[in-house]
């Protein structure tokens, strides 16, 4: 196997997207298009990877980091001109160079590997990735000679009747002998309507010089989809979503309604977990085995333990233990750590809190900036009052504490192990271990008060 290099074309603005966000940074299943391409290309054993950037160069470089070198195409003068910007990095190298667009998020490493192998086995100077489609209108046609090699690529508008009948099309992905590529780029002309330098012209140059130009026809046309507008973006999203869902189902995850379930490419889900309709799993989420998620649940960048149930709730940037029950309509906000066998019930919000094993907040509570021990019961309407309008303060609740309904714990405050707080209390001072704290006005009954009040209103 020869040395391998790759050039990703990511300089276009994407005018048809009608967006402030640069085209290749538009996400597909939660990840920018160009990141999908880089992740797949990086599996090919490359010696060097160069991403050609232009519009939004800094943002693209920030997204990709140090996994790629970068070349700047300050003025967009066509695809051949874009590749030529990588000359300072690659022109003197010997080997094979893959050229692919950064707006093809569905391409897989397997397809690109097959393309490279075809190129190397054929001893070609260039190899074109092609596909067969029944309705090829608008695509360049691949004309092969008697040896099966590429004779020429004919654009749809330039094709004759015989060529229009060809259903093998150019996908816009190529590999080249690296030295031949950069030698040919200087020969490409911009004598065309757009005044641009086009990469397919390199194919014609090499062919006219007597070199072999081969083609590899992929069976997976959907992988070659180029995203140029929001319609194509939605198509890519659907295809990627279906691919991810299928992979998870093959690995033992039950997805009740795949058309209404969204899973990020980086999520990991254990076997025998069930996902109900309306479930959205984003980012680097890890979900254990035998869980039940949804319906209508969002989990982002979180770790969920085995045998946990989350219904109609939201979990962000948090860690949940095993056998946890969440929801319905609960919200676990970032930096929360929920222990094992915990109950977080309906309309409970937890933020930046450590919540101990076997503890419960079953209804209508806000627990923020708190440390909750084990075997704690927080009654309906329990609130940690953590904010004074300027600063956040911490509430500490020990093991075995029982907080009565409709209680306010005004932070900073500590309720020590085994203490009880009476319903309706507003706690502003620490509660000692095993004490009962009552902080509410004493009840007063005024006999016959209602009759007196009504008579007063009548007079």
Swiss-Prot record:
Mg(2+) binds at residues 103, 228. UDP-N-acetyl-alpha-D-glucosamine binds at residues 9-12, 23, 73, 78-79, 140, 155, 170, 228, 333, 351, 366, 377. It catalyses: alpha-D-glucosamine 1-phosphate + acetyl-CoA = N-acetyl-alpha-D-glucosamine 1-phosphate + CoA + H(+); N-acetyl-alpha-D-glucosamine 1-phosphate + UTP + H(+) = UDP-N-acetyl-alpha-D-glucosamine + diphosphate. Pathway: Nucleotide-sugar biosynthesis; UDP-N-acetyl-alpha-D-glucosamine biosynthesis; N-acetyl-alpha-D-glucosamine 1-phosphate from alpha-D-glucosamine 6-phosphate (route II): step 2/2; Nucleotide-sugar biosynthesis; UDP-N-acetyl-alpha-D-glucosamine biosynthesis; UDP-N-acetyl-alpha-D-glucosamine from N-acetyl-alpha-D-glucosamine 1-phosphate: step 1/1; Bacterial outer membrane biogenesis; LPS lipid A biosynthesis. Transmembrane segments: none annotated. Residues 1-230 are annotated as: Pyrophosphorylase. Acetyl-CoA binds at residues 386-387, 423, 440. This is Bifunctional protein GlmU. It comes from Bacillus mycoides (strain KBAB4) (Bacillus weihenstephanensis). The lineage of its organism: Bacteria, Bacillati, Bacillota, Bacilli, Bacillales.
């Amino acid at each position: 196997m020869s040395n391998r290099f790759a050039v990703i074309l990511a300089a276009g603005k994407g005018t048809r997207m009608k967006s402030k966000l640069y085209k290749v940074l538009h996400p597909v299943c939660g990840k920018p298009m160009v990141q999908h391409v880089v992740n797949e290309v990086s599996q090919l054993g490359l010696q060097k990877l160069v991403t050609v950037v232009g519009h939004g160069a800094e943002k693209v470089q920030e997204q990709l980091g140090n996994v790629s070198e970068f070349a700047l195409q300050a003025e967009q003068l066509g695809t051949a001109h874009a590749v030529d910007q990588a000359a300072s990095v690659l022109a003197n190298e010997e080997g094979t160079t893959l050229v692919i667009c950064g707006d093809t998020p569905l391409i897989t490493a397997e397809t690109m590997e097959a393309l490279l192998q075809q190129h190397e086995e054929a001893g070609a100077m260039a190899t074109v990735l092609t596909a067969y489609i029944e309705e090829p209108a608008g695509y360049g046609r691949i004309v092969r000679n008697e040896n099966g090699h590429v004779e020429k690529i004919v654009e749809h508008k330039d094709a004759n009747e015989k060529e229009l009948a060809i259903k093998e099309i150019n996908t816009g992905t190529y590999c080249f002998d690296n030295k031949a590529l950069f030698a040919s780029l200087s020969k490409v002309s911009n004598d065309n309507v757009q005044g641009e330098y086009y990469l397919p012209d390199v194919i014609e140059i090499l062919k006219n010089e007597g070199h072999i130009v081969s083609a590899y026809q992929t069976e997976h046309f959907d992988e070659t989809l180029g995203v140029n507008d929001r319609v194509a973006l939605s198509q890519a999203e659907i295809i990627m979503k279906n691919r991810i869902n299928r992979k998870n189902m093959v690995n033992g995850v039950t997805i009740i309604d795949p058309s209404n379930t969204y899973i990020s490419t980086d999520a990991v889900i254990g076997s025998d977990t069930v996902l109900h309709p309306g479930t959205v799993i984003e980012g680097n989420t890890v979900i254990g085995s035998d869980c039940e998620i949804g319906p209508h649940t969002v989990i982002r960048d979180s770790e969920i333990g085995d045998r946990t149930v989350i219904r109609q709730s939201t979990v962000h940037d948090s860690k949940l233990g095993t056998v946890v029950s969440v929801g319905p309509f609960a919200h676990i906000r970032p930096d929360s750590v929920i222990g094992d066998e915990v109950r977080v019930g309906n309309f409970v919000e937890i933020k930046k809190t450590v919540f101990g094993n076997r503890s419960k907040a079953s209804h209508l509570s806000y627990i923020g900036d708190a440390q909750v021990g084990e075997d704690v019961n927080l009654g309906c309407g329990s609130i940690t009052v953590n904010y004074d309008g300027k600063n956040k303060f911490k509430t500490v609740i020990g093991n075995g504490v029982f907080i009565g309904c409709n209680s306010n714990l005004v932070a900073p405050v500590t309720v020590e192990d085994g203490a009880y707080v009476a319903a309706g209390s507003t706690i502003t001072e620490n509660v000692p271990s095993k004490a009962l704290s009552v902080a509410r006005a004493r009840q007063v009954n005024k006999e016959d008060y209602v009759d007196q009040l009504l008579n007063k209103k009548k007079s």
